[in-house]
Amino acid sequence: MIEAGELGDIRVVHAAYVQDWLTLPIDADGHKQAEWRTDPDRAGASACLADIGVHAHSLALFVTGLELDAVSADLATFVPGRRLDDNAHVLMRFQGGARGVLAASQVAVGNLNNLSLKVYGARGGLEWAGEEPETLRFTPYGEPSRILRRGGPGNTPLAIEGSRMPGGHPEGYVEGFANLYRGAAELISARRAGRPPERTAKLTPNVLDGARGVAFIEAAVKSSQKDGAWTSARFD
């Protein structure tokens, strides 16, 4: 829909990924999953932002097609004794002029695994939440909001190709991984056969997408260390 211009030029992007599983100091109590994620020797320079915030970043770039220009970040650690961040707020400037904000937290009580994205353009807006993945809220400017359901009227051809179950039959997380594996296999098969890959396979993340995520994390960490100073996040 964005690629087709239904939102017009993108102006504002809100991305968030919030959880509450690190609200208590379980990393200091032998919880293996929490322990390594908050250990700078094993996890690197960031915990929360590198663990889940980067997924919100990747989602925002994938959906909008935008590229980052610079970030202003505030990484915080709320649980005493924890060595890496458990909360992150990042202001984003995109190449082309759009603005964005990304929030990531693992101490947001009441949130199990809440990934969400809101995109607003000159002609309309889109809103999606990972805990309700079957629906997409689309609002053309000056018109009533429309709730689009996976497998229902209004789905784009690519969305239909990415679905496996009929509309109304819950689908999502596991099937998303299956689509990634299928896309990767198709890219390999097409390369070996010397033919163009299927169009859905072209959406499969590659090493450059991973490198973009690393560049984003590094820029945000540097910005936070400089009290939120605007820091280049360009991936050239």
Regions found by a protein language model. Give the residues of each.
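Hydrophobic side-chain positions on well-ordered alpha-helices
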Residues: 1-4, 187-191, 210, 223-224
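Predominantly a Rossmann-like dinucleotide-binding segment in NAD(P)-dependent oxidoreductases
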Residues: 1-82, 136, 227
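C-terminal glycine/acidic-rich active-site capping loop/insertion
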Residues: 33, 37, 62, 70, ...
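Conserved loop-to-helix N-cap of the C-terminal "lid" that shapes the substrate pocket in Rossmann-like
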Residues: 50-53, 174, 204-211
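Glycine-rich, aromatic-lined ligand/substrate-binding cores of catalytic
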Residues: 52-71, 76-125, 130-134
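A general structural signal for well-ordered alpha-helical segments in protein cores
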Residues: 56-57, 180-185, 217
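NAD(P)-dependent dehydrogenase/reductase Rossmann-like domain
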Residues: 127, 195-199, 205-208, 212-213, ...
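Alpha-helical scaffold segments in carbohydrate-active enzymes
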Residues: 213-220
